[in-house]
Every structure is written in structure tokens, then in C-alpha cells.
């Protein structure tokens, strides 16, 4: 039998064929090199032509592949299976705010209060819960998909939406304090992350005044529909989160069983005199949550004043759809000042318990003012001398470092000024 013919070489070398150029051979060259390879002093390689299609007799090729050599074992191994990553797992705001994967210190000294990563400087502080209390919680905590992203995902199935709502419900349940054995650092970090997501969503998503500021009645026939839309309402979400914040502060101030109330040693640090169960990181996270709450309310009030000034049509829609109110049998006319006063009263009702539990100075409060003539002992978290000094010092440092941006005091003054403007609406 005649030996099989060797495959013919290509006319062009590999280099010219890759660049899709005409390959011109140098006459009488010892290695039959082309002009370009000879000028660049590179080896001119011309691979053999590969026949398209399948081999003529694949059965004959199988015995040859039964005993592969060690050099070809790696080539004959099957490729690894592809990993399917669900799209919805990459569309959550938790993935955007995954600060725990950065492996760096949580630098918050130069970050303004109204930013998403608001917090306090942590240099030179030995905390029991470490810096992780100011960032995202451990990966065992289930991440949630915010509701405003679910409204955008129109192609999401019903089962996927149910799973997202179930995860959100699980995280909301973790925010509920249970007894004295809860991890306050974990709950505070969850609360801080939830407030950060709400502020980000409020500043990045469109704001519909006809839905956010809609006035409804308990006996209204459409009350059930309004309750369904409440989870997409920024005002309803911050009201619920503020109530959870106040409940968490109340559980923190609950006396510890077996403490006796006054078992603080003389050599105890000022931090232990504020609260023995909280680290410095926890106190800073509490102040960060308070400033984030004020920033959210300030953003809502700013949106309301902007809509009331430049979009009177939306205000008329809200007032016309409001139920009829009667005072002493006299119908109350629906006007803009009534809507603005209701918003201010609702905000004061949400902020008052938080400010009382924190025990902040009057200049840092929006709704609660300390009674100067009362001699009762203040029971707020920062009502003591050490707490007042710590709070004032941190606020002053943050205001100075913020520069032109709104620091902690700037957020408070901005919200106070916006409330004054709303009261002047006519």
C-alpha cells in the first residue's frame, strides 16, 4: 500500500495569513521565508492546511486515542461546565453596596451626612464589634431586593417576585428586637443599610406626588389598594423604618438583668457610662442612622416644595382625590396648607420618639425640645455628660470636614429651613 500523502502546505505563512496580507516568498531563500518575515528577522512558519469537515474514518481514530500520553491528557479532558448565574442575583442594591468585599477600612471622615455611605470616623478607637458594624453585616444575612427594582423588572415571574418579597420580609423580621440577647451591632448595621438604600432610591428614582402624598381614609373603599402601594411609597417606608429605629433604641436602653442599675466602676471609661452593652462603633452607627433618617425626610420635603411650586397640577390632583373632612360639622376645604401641615405633623410624630430616646441637645432636634424647667433625670442615650460631649465633638468635627458639603449640622439646618418654608405655604 502506498503511504498516505502529507497534507499540502498553505501558500501564505501564518503571519501574513493572520494579518490578511499577500505573502511574497524570497527567491532562493534557504528556509523559503517570505519578505515580511525576513525583514523582521522572524521565523517564517507555514502550517499545513486543515481539511474542513469530519475525518473520513472516525472509527480508526478511536483506538489511537485510547492510550493518551501524559502530554496530551490535559488536552483531552472535557471542559468545565458553565456556571449559570441568575440575573436577579446581580440586580439588587445589596450587590451595589457590597462594602464587605473590599477588605478595607471604612473611611467615613470626609463623607457628607447625606451620602449613601454616611458614618463617623473610627481612627484610634478600640471597639468590641470592630469596623464591621459600620459596613454590611456578615454574608449569612440574607440580602434583599428593594421594591423599586422589582417594579422595573417587568419580565420577572411571579415566583421570583414572591422569593424577593420573602427575603425582604426575613430581613425586616431581623430588625425587630427580641429580648436582651440580640446582637445590637448587627441590627444597627442592617438598619443603616436599609436607610442607605432608601436614600439612594429616593435620590435616583422619579417621585410621583400624586401617589406619595395621597390622602386616604380608613373607611375608603380603595384602602386595600393604597396599602398594596405603600411598600413603593418613600414616605411610608421611612415611617416604618423610623418606628423600627425607635423600637431598637428602646430595647437598647432596657436595663440589663443583674446589673443592679449602678454597678459602674470608678475606673470605667466614658463609653461604659453611656451604655455598657454598646461599643463605640455601635454609638457611631446610631448617630449615622439618625442623620440618614433626617436626610431622607429632608429629601422628601424638598421634593414636596419643588412639586408644590412648579407642578400645581399634581397638587390639585392630590387635593381633589382627598376624602371630605369635617370639623364641628363644618367641611374643611382641601388646600395646600392642609397638606403641608399634615406632612409636618406626621414627620414630627416619627422623629419625636427617636430624639427622646437619643437625648440629643435641642439644637440637634427637629421635633422634640427638652423642658428646661423640669428637674427629672434625662434617660436618653446621649443625655449624660459624656454622651453630650461625644455627640457635640463628633458633630463639630464632621461639620468642619464636610466643607462646602452639608455636614451633620447642615442636614439638620436644611430640614428645619424646609419645614419653615412649608408652614408658609398658602
UniProtKB/Swiss-Prot annotation:
Record-linked PROSITE patterns: ZN2_CY6_FUNGAL_1 (PS00463), ZN2_CY6_FUNGAL_2 (PS50048)
Biotech and industrial use: Calbistrin A has been reported to possess a number of interesting bioactivities including antifungal active against Candida albicans and cytotoxic toward both healthy and leukemic human cells.
Region of interest called Disordered, as start-end residue ranges on this chain: 46-82
InterPro entries linked: Zn2-C6_fun-type_DNA-bd_sf, Zn2Cys6_DnaBD
Gene3D superfamilies in the cross-refs: Zn(2)-C6 fungal-type DNA-binding domain (4.10.240.10)
Gene Ontology molecular-function annotations: DNA binding; DNA-binding transcription factor activity, RNA polymerase II-specific; zinc ion binding
CDD domains per UniProt: GAL4 (cd00067)
Disruption phenotype: Abolishes the production of calbistrin and of the related metabolites decumbenones, whereas production of unrelated compounds, such as andrastin C, remains unaffected. Results in a significant down-regulation of the expression of the calbistrin biosynthesis cluster genes calA, calB and calF.
UniProt cross-references to Pfam families, sorted A to Z: Zn_clus
Signals that turn on the gene: Expression is induced in complex medium (Czapek yeast autolysate medium) supporting calbistrin production.
Location in or out of the cell: Nucleus
Disulphides: none
GO CC terms of this entry: nucleus
Keyword match Zinc: yes
Sorted UniProt keywords: DNA-binding, Metal-binding, Nucleus, Transcription, Transcription regulation, Zinc
DNA-binding region in chain numbering: 13-44
Function comment: Transcription activator that specifically regulates the expression of the gene cluster that mediates the biosynthesis of calbistrins and related compounds such as decumbenones. Calbistrin A is a secondary metabolite with an interesting structure that was recently found to have bioactivity against leukemia cells. It consists of two polyketides linked by an ester bond: a bicyclic decalin containing polyketide and a linear 12 carbon dioic acid structure.
Designated name of the protein: Transcriptional regulator calC
Amino acid at each position: 500500500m502506498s503511504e498516505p500523502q502529507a497534507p499540502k502546505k498553505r501558500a501564505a505563512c501564518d503571519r501574513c495569513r493572520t494579518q490578511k496580507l499577500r505573502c511574497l516568498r524570497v527567491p532562493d531563500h534557504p528556509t523559503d521565508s517570505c519578505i515580511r518575515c525576513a525583514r523582521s528577522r522572524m521565523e517564517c512558519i507555514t502550517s499545513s492546511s486543515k481539511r474542513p469537515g469530519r475525518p473520513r474514518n472516525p472509527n480508526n481514530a478511536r483506538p489511537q486515542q485510547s492510550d493518551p500520553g501524559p502530554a496530551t491528557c490535559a488536552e483531552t479532558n472535557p471542559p468545565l461546565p458553565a456556571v449559570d448565574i441568575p440575573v436577579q442575583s446581580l440586580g439588587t442594591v445589596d450587590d451595589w453596596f457590597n462594602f464587605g468585599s473590599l477588605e478595607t477600612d471604612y473611611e467615613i471622615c470626609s463623607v457628607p451626612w447625606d451620602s449613601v455611605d454616611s458614618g463617623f470616623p473610627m481612627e484610634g478607637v478600640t471597639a468590641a464589634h470592630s469596623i464591621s458594624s459600620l459596613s454590611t453585616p456578615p454574608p449569612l444575612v440574607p440580602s434583599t431586593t428593594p421594591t423599586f427594582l422589582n417594579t422595573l423588572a417587568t419580565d420577572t415571574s411571579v415566583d421570583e417576585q414572591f422569593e424577593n418579597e420573602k427575603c425582604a420580609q426575613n430581613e425586616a423580621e431581623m430588625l425587630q428586637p427580641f429580648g436582651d440577647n440580640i446582637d445590637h451591632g448587627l441590627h444597627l448595621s442592617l438598619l443603616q443599610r436599609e436607610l442607605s438604600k432608601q436614600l439612594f432610591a429616593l435620590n435616583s428614582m422619579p417621585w410621583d406626588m400624586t401617589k406619595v402624598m395621597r390622602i386616604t381614609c380608613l373607611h375608603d373603599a380603595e384602602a386595600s389598594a393604597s396599602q398594596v402601594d405603600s411598600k413603593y411609597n418613600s414616605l411610608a417606608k421611612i415611617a416604618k423604618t423610623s418606628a423600627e429605629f425607635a423600637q431598637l433604641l428602646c430595647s437598647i436602653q432596657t436595663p440589663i438583668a443583674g446589673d443592679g442599675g449602678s454597678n459602674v466602676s470608678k475606673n470605667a471609661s466614658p463609653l461604659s457610662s453611656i451604655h455598657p452593652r454598646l461599643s463605640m462603633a455601635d454609638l457611631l452607627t446610631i448617630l449615622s442612622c439618625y442623620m440618614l433618617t433626617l436626610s431622607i425626610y429632608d429629601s422628601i420635603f424638598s421634593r414636596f416644595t419643588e412639586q408644590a411650586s412648579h407642578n400645581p397640577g399634581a397638587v390639585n390632583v392630590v387635593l381633589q382625590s382627598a376624602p371630605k373632612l369635617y370639623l364641628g360639622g363644618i367641611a374643611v376645604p382641601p388646600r395646600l396648607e392642609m397638606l403641608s401641615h399634615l406632612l409636618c405633623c406626621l414627620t414630627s410624630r416619627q422623629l419625636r420618639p427617636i430624639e427622646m430616646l437619643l437625648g440629643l441637645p435641642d439644637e440637634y432636634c427637629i421635633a422634640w425640645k427638652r423642658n428646661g424647667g423640669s428637674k427629672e433625670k434625662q434617660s436618653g442615650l446621649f443625655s449624660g455628660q459624656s454622651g453630650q460631649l461625644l455627640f457635640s465633638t463628633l458633630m463639630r468635627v464632621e461639620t468642619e470636614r464636610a466643607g462646602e458639603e452639608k455636614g451633620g449640622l447642615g442636614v439638620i439646618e436644611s430640614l428645619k429651613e424646609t419645614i419653615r418654608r412649608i408652614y408658609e405655604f398658602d
